Amino acid sequence: MANITVTFTITEFCLHTGVTEEELNEIVGLGVIEPYEDDNTDWQFDDRAASVVQRALRLREELALDWPGIAVALTLLEENSRLREENRLLLQRLSRFISHP
């Protein structure tokens, strides 16, 4: 199965997500998203970056956070998700050793 990556130029990305170029520069500077790796010198972003920015915009709207706060919140949410998955896997392993009547 082919793996297709959709990329956006800066202008397309801003139009698609609703962020300004200034906000995009701040978001990239904070490490919330990174430009898509390409030989092209102009920034390009993939569809995953668009999803992250849309999630960030929801946090901004719902919690009235600034971009640095959103960066921290997204980092904590990702860590929480990773830990939940690790916990699920460990519980699955543990259940093999616990007898069920």
Curated annotation (Swiss-Prot):
InterPro entries per the UniProt record, alphabetical: CbpM
Protein task: Interacts with CbpA and inhibits both the DnaJ-like co-chaperone activity and the DNA binding activity of CbpA. Together with CbpA, modulates the activity of the DnaK chaperone system. Does not inhibit the co-chaperone activity of DnaJ.
Family label: Belongs to the CbpM family.
Designated name of the protein: Chaperone modulatory protein CbpM
